[in-house]
Regions:
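Beta-strand-loop-alpha-helix segment that lines the small-molecule cofactor/substrate pocket
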Residues: 1-16, 31
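Glycine-/Pro-rich loop/turn segments that contact NAD(P) or position catalytic residues
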Residues: 2-3, 18-26
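Short, solvent-exposed turn/loop segments enriched in Gly/Ser/Thr/Pro and often Arg
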Residues: 13-17, 42-45
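Contiguous beta-strand/loop segments that form the cofactor/metal-binding neighborhood of enzyme cores
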Residues: 5-6, 22-23, 35-186
Length: 186
């Protein structure tokens, strides 16, 4: 944006479209949890395999060169296309880059968080041996004063919260714990 002197804006559709986040923020800001000392975000990395990276001819309805845009030219593979493109560094940063902004939005909003002091992360590709590139297991620690904030990416739902689905945010306070997804909380 700076190079081309453009103004940009990032919006988060879940923040605006689903009333659950607003209700979670109200509960946390009202003090129902006490002082929140820990936020843990969990995203399931999904199924064990998404297919293989076999090269083929793009379907006739897909203008593959247009779809690639400025990304490096690569042979077409359905795995590099719709729905799974996010697992290749040429196009995305994987599940973390795709989903972190959505589920962490509620924590930033509820706790009035700004930029962390530092972030450390470790991960790799251990489970989905399908030719994709981005991590399928990942742990990130965000350093905020007085707050333990982590993001975890692993196969399967968060242990203990399987009933909540594949992406959750857990707020642990001195008085209570709250777990939320995009559409519900408890």
């Amino acid at each position: 944006a700076e190079t081309y002197q453009r103004v940009t804006q990032m919006g988060n559709h879940i923040h605006n479209d689903l009333p659950n986040y607003r209700r979670v923020v109200e509960r946390i800001k009202s003090g129902q949890l006490g002082k929140v000392t820990r936020v843990q975000i969990w995203k399931s990395s999904g199924e064990v395999t998404r297919g293989n990276l076999s090269e083929t001819t793009p379907p006739p309805e897909l203008d593959y060169d247009f779809w690639l845009g400025v990304a490096p030219k690569r042979p077409y593979s359905p795995l590099r296309s719709h729905g799974t493109w996010r697992y290749f560094w040429d196009y995305s940063g994987g599940d973390f880059m795709d989903f972190w902004c959505h589920i962490s939005d509620v924590a930033y909003w509820a706790l009035d968080l700004k930029a962390p002091d530092r972030i450390s992360a470790i991960g790799g590709r251990f489970f989905n041996l399908d030719g994709a590139e981005t991590p399928d297991a990942f742990e990130a620690q965000f350093s905020f004063p007085g707050l333990n904030y982590t993001f975890s990416l692993h196969p399967g739902p968060m242990p203990g919260f399987e009933h909540m689905g594949n992406i959750v945010c857990v707020f642990q306070g001195t008085e209570a714990t709250l777990v939320t997804t995009y559409g519900k909380h408890e």
